[in-house]
Amino acid sequence: MSKPEYFIGLMSGTSMDGVDAVLVDFSQAKPQLIAGHTQAIPKHLLKGLQRLCNPAADEINRLGRLDRAVGSLFADAVNALLEKTNIPKSQIIAIGSHGQTVRHMPNLEVGFTLQIGDPNTIAVETGIDVIADFRRKDIALGGQGAPLVPAFHQQVFAEKDQIRVILNIGGIANVTYLPGNSEQVLGFDTGPGNTLIDAYILQNLEQAFDEDGQWADSGNSNQALLTQMLSHPYFSLHYPKSTGRELFNQAWLEQQLANFSHLDAEDIQSTLLDLTCHSIANDINKLAPKGQLFVCGGGALNGALMKRLTQLVPGYQLQTTSALGVDAKWVEGIAFAWLAMRHHHNLPANLPAVTGASKSAVLGGRYSAK
């Protein structure tokens, strides 16, 4: 047997529903998940991050403090993950940390993206080298800096002569189109995933998320509101494209609801679920009329979402990535362990056709624990 090649992946998405930490062995043809752990984000830290995502005065001090605090949180996730295994830290080659996105503005004249969670702090508090800051090289090369996971999807999920679409539904939803032949792999953000659904149930019922989509399923979707929301210019943009809370946030939702105050809250929640499903389905149906659709991320656990989506993509067999041997909950964490592995071996990790970068490149920087 070949010697294990252990990397850890750390991911916290726009939904901010926890830090996923995964331990992965890359010594085989396909990555092997050894262990996974989700570290809850403490309420005081979550509030600070949510405030930082909205433009305001005195951001620099808050940014600096939160950068260190998120770094410590990510380190806690790694240490808790390793407590679940018998693998010593000395055997871990590196941690791949996504960080926490607080701004993603790739379409400005000088585009930028900003993830916090100081990798120096993670390295010091875990004793393991950290590879981080994966997105900014792609932006420096004229790309969107996102999505980065399609290169990983291509390596792990592509199958000759089969059209496959990998759909990740986190706060934002993104798709990877794997044509199964010499055609170009494509990938982009379709729009909101769980971000608006989560925000609205938190505001109304003080619940972090709509479990299994039950609240949305108790309401009736409003066609006029859905049509209005789907008229957002982002949905008609051609890829490469990426988005985030900067476009689809509480303020945007309040604007959309201004003329719909007569609607019951559960009807609005049902319409928000439809917004996610319709924006995803519209893009998938444009990519190819039929194929296999594999879903991962938090949205894969939402039964109402999966049911509605199935109805909107009749040409597709819909399953989660677990059917391909990769647990739907941990796909993004594994992807960032993979990105760290690519950096360690000096291999490129972005797909210019996906991000719009001028060339493929080695992504991220290494922060030594020594």
Swiss-Prot record:
Keyword annotations: ATP-binding, Carbohydrate metabolism, Kinase, Nucleotide-binding, Transferase
Annotated CDD domains: ASKHA_NBD_ANMK (cd24050)
Cystines in this chain: none
Its EC number(s): 2.7.1.170
Keyword field contains Kinase: yes
Role this protein plays: Catalyzes the specific phosphorylation of 1,6-anhydro-N-acetylmuramic acid (anhMurNAc) with the simultaneous cleavage of the 1,6-anhydro ring, generating MurNAc-6-P. Is required for the utilization of anhMurNAc either imported from the medium or derived from its own cell wall murein, and thus plays a role in cell wall recycling.
The family this protein is said to belong to: Belongs to the anhydro-N-acetylmuramic acid kinase family.
HAMAP family: AnhMurNAc_kinase
Protein name (database record): Anhydro-N-acetylmuramic acid kinase
Organism: Shewanella denitrificans (strain OS217 / ATCC BAA-1090 / DSM 15013)
Gene, per the UniProt record: anmK
